[in-house]
């Protein structure tokens, strides 16, 4: 009983209807109740028991022998769909089946089906689903009793799919598919309404019956065969891999006992059968897209197939290995190394772009598993699988740049989840050393402007912009920094050298950036140098120099010969700080010296307010408020009046006071006067804006106060109305108990 195929009878055609020999048990002498016998079903002996004058077979024994390669759920669903009713055993009958060896000792219940039903059930799983041999113009006279009921002609010649309109209604002459016909009814004078039991689209086989109750056995069997045709999806549509091609409508006749039958197998239930089964060697050399089948459950339950899969493709990417003699091992080593999850070591096929078409035969990157690998392996794998066109476009860049661009490649690699991580997290996963990233923290948002000059002007104070990469002119790539890189900018910007690969202007940009950052960081030392150089001037001239000393650095950048002689002295001593620390010192100096550095920032990025929509009114309000508070502080504060933080900054940068002093002296008086006028105009403009904000805020406060007063009045009216209504209801309903002064007045809302 272990090997099913070898015990099939030699001349038995599994697709034909049972002949009279198989039905001889029905035509014999009358059967005794609970009579035990043994019946051969597909060559397997099955215990049968006489119940209610009918010989019934043990369904559990059939499931454990003939259908042992199918799950209990599959067998149950197919039995229900075929309309096979299961009769439960009594405890006495169950004990008889136990002693006959059909049921194990631990069994609690057993279902019994007739031999004809058992043959139909096994045939739906094991037999070839060829249409029954019927006359050419034959039609079944069928009817159903769902709702008001209906009657029609089922034409088998039209029944070529599960949704084929093969039933012609006898009342309206319209054609319906079987699953729709049971919902189609006509009310006749003698019909009565019947609420159908479990009438859904898949239960038509239960509700659709032959109109003639006394039909011949041939018609009944043909009707059963027709009902079993497209039931639950036939697994005989494509032949198994490695088998010789023959038409499915002509099954092989006269198989010898040594030949394996073409019995398709599906989900295994017995774990013992999975060991020592070799796979066939005829594996196709191209991958196919797996189409999931309805009857497959979760992926964890799918083991390696026992026999060649009946589909032309393995389901859910269960690609078989290329090794011919390799044994599919233990059940806990089930391999899902297929199309969806290819791992580098055990995938049978190479990486192949099956979901997104490519031009020509370009190799595309696969989905890499997150396996622990040394960084060099990851780099080599990434470089080998780069697109050919990308490599030709970026041949001028360094390997570091091509690696970074590979991380930002197209949607086939689905790196959006990597961008959601921080920079350190994604770097540690991929094994890339932290020094392989460029510093190009421009913005977390994509700039709208497309030309390079306006971007450089827009982000002029934030660092050198290297321009967009050649070959990528879309706005998506204009901003070099991804969203996860601008989360923590000072991770990379402390140690990495700021190298611009394309323009090779790193040295000049670094010196200019150092001077501008250092000068912005030390406004108090500049004021000390001024006070030593221009002691004879009055307080107003001191304010003028304080306002304009920072612009001397911006104007002196156009004279690099004058700057580089002084800049080289201090290049080795000062490094470019991260932008957060720069802005922190910038805010500290603003609080001590009014709005001098604020004005410097406003004039150098004049276009920011027009081009950047992100500078909102809420951001300007505290800055303007700080400016207004510091108007009087400028005229009252002496240059020597400093705090401890300022002295620490002064110690770092005090020796550069002479440099700025020379620059200020070299400037013409007209330039200073011109810049002072600009600063005064800016101050007036900011004061006007702040006054407008203040007025609008006061108006809003007044509106809110009036709204609150109105709400208080409304609540008072509601409270009074509630009290009056309650008093009136007390008076109307209980006139003898309420004397007009009702004490029960629960407040509707708190006062």
Swiss-Prot record:
InterPro entries: c-SKI_SMAD4-bd_dom (IPR014890), DNA-bd_dom_put_sf (IPR009061), SAND-like_dom_sf (IPR010919), SKI/SNO/DAC (IPR003380), Ski_DNA-bd_sf (IPR037000), Tscrpt_reg_SKI_SnoN (IPR023216)
Residue span of region Disordered: 1-30, 234-267, 386-434, 459-569, 600-635
Origin superkingdom: Eukaryota
One Gene Ontology biological process: negative regulation of BMP signaling pathway
Record field: compositional bias (Basic and acidic residues): 416-428, 559-569, 603-612, 620-635
Gene Ontology MF, one: SMAD binding
Ranges of Polar residues composition bias in the record: 14-27, 244-259, 539-558
Residue ranges that the Swiss-Prot or TrEMBL entry lists as coiled coil: 666-704
Record family assignment: Belongs to the SKI family.
Protein name: SKI family transcriptional corepressor 1 homolog-B
Gene this chain is encoded by: skor1b
């Amino acid at each position: 009983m272990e090997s099913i195929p070898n015990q099939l009878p030699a001349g038995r055609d599994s697709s034909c209807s049972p002949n009279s020999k198989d039905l001889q048990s029905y035509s014999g002498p009358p059967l005794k109740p609970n009579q035990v016998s043994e019946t051969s079903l597909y060559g397997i002996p099955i215990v049968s028991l006489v119940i209610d004058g009918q010989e019934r077979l043990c369904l559990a024994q059939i499931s454990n022998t003939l259908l042992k390669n199918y799950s209990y759920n599959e067998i149950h669903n197919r039995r229900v769909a075929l309309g096979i009713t299961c009769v439960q055993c009594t405890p006495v009958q169950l004990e008889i089946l136990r002693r006959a060896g059909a049921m194990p000792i631990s069994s609690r219940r057993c279902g019994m089906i007739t031999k004809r039903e058992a043959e139909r059930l096994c045939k739906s799983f094991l037999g070839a689903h060829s249409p029954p041999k019927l006359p050419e113009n034959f039609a079944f006279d069928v009817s159903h009793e769902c709702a008001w009921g209906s009657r029609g002609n089922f034409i088998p010649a039209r029944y070529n799919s599960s949704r084929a309109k093969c039933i012609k209604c006898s009342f309206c002459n319209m054609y319906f598919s079987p699953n729709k016909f049971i919902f189609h009814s006509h009310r006749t004078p003698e019909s009565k309404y019947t609420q159908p039991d479990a009438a859904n689209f898949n239960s038509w086989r239960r509700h659709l019956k032959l109109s003639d109750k006394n039909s011949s056995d041939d018609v009944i069997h043909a009707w059963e065969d027709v009902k079993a045709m497209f039931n639950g999806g036939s697994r005989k549509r494509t032949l198994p891999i490695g088998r010789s091609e023959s038409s499915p409508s002509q099954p092989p006749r006269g198989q010898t006992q040594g030949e394996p039958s073409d019995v398709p197998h599906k989900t295994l239930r017995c774990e013992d059968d999975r060991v020592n089964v070799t796979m066939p060697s005829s594996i196709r050399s191209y991958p196919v897209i797996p189409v999931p089948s309805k009857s497959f459950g979760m992926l964890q339950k799918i083991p390696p197939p026992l026999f060649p899969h009946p589909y032309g493709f393995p389901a859910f990417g269960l690609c078989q290995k290329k090794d011919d003699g390799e044994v599919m091992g233990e059940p806990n080593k089930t391999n899902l190394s297929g199309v969806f999850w290819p791992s580098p070591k055990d995938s049978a096929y190479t990486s192949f772009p099956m979901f997104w078409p490519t031009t020509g035969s370009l190799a595309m990157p696969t989905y890499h598993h997150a396996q622990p690998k040394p960084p060099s392996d990851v780099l080599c794998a990434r470089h080998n699988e780069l697109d050919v066109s990308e490599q030709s476009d970026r041949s001028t860049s360094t390997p570091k740049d091509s690696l970074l661009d590979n991380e930002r490649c197209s949607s086939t690699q689905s790196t959006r989840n990597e961008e959601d991580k921080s920079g350190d997290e994604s770097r540690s996963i991929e094994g890339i050393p932290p020094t392989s990233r460029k510093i190009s923290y421009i913005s977390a948002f994509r700039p709208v402007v497309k030309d390079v000059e306006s971007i450089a002007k827009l982000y002029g104070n934030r660092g050198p912009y290297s321009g967009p990469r050649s070959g990528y002119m879309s706005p998506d790539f204009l901003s070099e920094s991804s969203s996860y890189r601008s989360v923590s900018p000072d991770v990379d910007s402390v140690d990495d050298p700021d190298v611009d690969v394309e323009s090779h202007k790193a040295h000049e940009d670094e010196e200019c950036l150092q001077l501008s950052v250092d000068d912005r960081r030390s406004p108090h030392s500049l004021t000390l140098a001024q006070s030593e150089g221009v002691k004879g001037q009055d307080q107003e001239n001191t304010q003028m120099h304080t306002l304009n000393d920072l612009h001397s650095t911006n104007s002196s950048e156009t004279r690099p010969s004058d700057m580089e002689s002084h800049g080289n002295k201090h290049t080795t001593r000062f490094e470019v700080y991260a932008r957060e620390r720069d802005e922190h010192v910038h805010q500290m100096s603003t609080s001590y010296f009014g709005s001098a550095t604020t004005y410097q920032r406003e004039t150098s990025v004049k276009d920011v307010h027009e081009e950047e929509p992100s500078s909102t009114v809420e951001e300007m309000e505290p800055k303007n408020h700080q400016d207004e508070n510091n108007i009087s502080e400028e005229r009252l504060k002496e240059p020597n009046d400093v705090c401890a933080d300022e002295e620490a900054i002064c110690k770092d940068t005090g020796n550069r006071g002479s440099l700025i002093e020379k620059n200020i002296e070299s400037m013409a008086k007209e330039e200073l006067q011109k810049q002072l006028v600009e600063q005064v105009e800016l101050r007036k403009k900011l004061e006007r804006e702040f006054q407008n904000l203040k007025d609008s805020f006061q108006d809003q406060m007044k509106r809110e106060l009036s709204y609150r007063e109105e709400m208080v009045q409304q609540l008072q009216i509601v409270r009074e109305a509630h009290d009056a209504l309650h008093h009136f209801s007390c008076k109307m309903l209980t006139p003898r108990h309420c004397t007009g002064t009702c004490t029960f007045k629960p407040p509707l809302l708190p006062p």
